């Protein structure tokens, strides 16, 4: 009988992960090296730190240089700029504020910033800011916006191209403002709210918005056109692209997001679930708060094509998921992130409890990152 049911399982094709031989540490290291080494060569990446979460624990791999001039190697402690992966932290912090009853995604934006008196802001909700559907806020906050007065002027003068909740246009100016307003009821500045409500409870002790003096020795240089660069400060940078961290903290971040049931803090646990909830469908992709999800299984080319800037940064029509769907374990959950000198990628599949973090000190095309990550995770199944 036992043999018969085993045969049935094989015939039904449900045996893949249940009956797959576990990948050994040595095999995993080989898969990572055989994927990352040619990628770095092809994309001229000076240094990379990779974490693979497999069988309940992170495995770390480091390659190349954190600082070319000083000949400093990348280590698991090296700090990288996350770029837009910072948005996943903003999404979870916003989710935590919702869980505490401080804000609601259905609230009007003007409730948290009454000075926004422009007619165009009527009918724009916190949800629209958080998910890039306010009507066409720009990718970047303009450089001339340097203080709160010019920030207010910028948002007052902005005119939407589309009705709220109809079109997704990826924008730092959208989720950045969501993050800034979401913490207002807490009475804390953004950095303090992030530290006390998200970073500390998850023991992410080497994750920073502003890298302290004592940690500067670990901060990698980014490289752009052969020059060493780091991100410049800007309005709403903390919320949209300002987090710096190491591969160990990022692995812990992925594990917390992949298994929120293991998070002790009740509002944070709920905040993580809200960030991976599905608010809009855009083609085969679902928009969360910071996180983006596709139904698993998904073909590599679907994920790769969706990550291309031509698609990711294009205005696309949205279909509302109403009510929002709670997190789906059979999902490819991911986010890309770049600054002038850094390029990162994070992806995980909650159902399989596998995930990957790829941090690099140069910005290179998203499709190459996604392809490499997919290849490595595919080898674990």
UniProtKB/Swiss-Prot annotation:
Catalytic activity, EC: 3.5.2.6
Claim: Signal is one of the keywords in the record: yes
Top-level taxonomic group: Bacteria
Effect of residue 152 to V: In strain: Q980R
Active-site residues per Swiss-Prot or TrEMBL entry: 84, 170
Keyword 4Fe-4S part of the UniProt annotation: no
Function, as annotated: This protein is a serine beta-lactamase with a substrate specificity for cephalosporins.
Protein name: Beta-lactamase
Species per Swiss-Prot/TrEMBL record: Enterobacter cloacae
